[in-house]
Amino acid sequence: MGDEGKKPEDTRRRPMVVSKGWVQGIALVMILGFTVMGILAYHTYNDSIPIPDKVVSTTGEVLFTHDDIVAGQEAFNNRGLMEYGSIVGHGGYLGPDFTADYLRRAATLTLDVRIKARENQPHQANIKDWRTNRYDSRTGVLVLSRQQTAAYHHLVSYYTTYFGRNSHNLGLLADDIKGPAQARHLTDFFAWTAWGAAADRPGHSYSYTNNWPADPTVANRPTADMVVWSVLSLIVLIGGTGVMFAIYGRWSKNIGWHESETPSLSFIPPSQVGLTKSQRATSWFFFVIAVLFLFQTLVGAAAEHYRADISSFFGFDLAAWLPYNLARTWHVQLALFWTAAAFLAGGIFLAPFVSGKEPRRQHVLTYVLLGAVAFVVFGSLTSEALSVYGVSWAKGPVFGQQWEYIDLSKMFQ
């Protein structure tokens, strides 16, 4: 009796509502786009800042090693600091860009030493010191000058205090970095990125990061190539969009300049549209999407509150429970999750209309996919929280947090 009012599943083959030309065009764009992205990724990894085997002073003192830099990077990721500050200009911005912060502080310290020593043209000497590349690719050894070494030791102490017991006043957990060893590794990581941002790339007059971040203390200014390619990219983007519309307007028979007649639109009442089982199953997707969107809004509001009052939430110590880096991590991840879930649900719902048919038992796979989405969402949010809180086993490549936008751990990636 309960099945009498239920509409039978529509299994008839329907005509495609999208022409094959559009499908082929999208496929071509995707192939070309991913090819270009692959080429850029190849050059990014091959032309990136080299990680020296060891960094030494002019007296031969080993300041830090390759493993120390990697350990600092892992600590930076695991504690969610990418969602608090940034590195080489990429990340969250409640905190500083630690590359720029280290570079400015260290360069100012080395300049002050030269001014106090009454060196001839201290500003030019300071610029030359920072832009000189003392990395030997054959031995893997990077040598820091006497002034840079002194600045490094000073900043180890500074960042140890920065991430110490009073870090809750910065929107982080108190004692966010566990112990002086981890703070030193973080400083090693910052120092390495600052060196790469200032030292000239071999054979060129600009740094490994194209003189970014900008800092007049070390003569980090935009290069001519950077300006030219930035302008050209804007011209191609805007001009290419205009050319695309011009071509479509010239040859389209529906909405172009020479259309034969105005196309008429007709809509089928929703009550007359037969839905498949998988299309009905997507209703659960949209319910989950709404819940994720609501949660994203709430944690986003908490993250923005830190910009108004970084030390408390109407008298409540919010950083002790939901530090800024965790709130922003969840905010960014939830935006990606509900958007991805919406694309999945939209694809499942529209596929039968586009293809004209639906594979048998696809609704079962739809529920399996919904379960997989739930596992990834709740599992990754939990692992990110454990990573930020510094739980000993929730770190490293398996459970630890990663770079911004791909914060979810390898376990759920």
Q: What function would you assign to each model-found segment?
A:
Residues 256-269, 319-327, 349-366, 393-400:
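Flexible loop linkers connecting adjacent transmembrane helices
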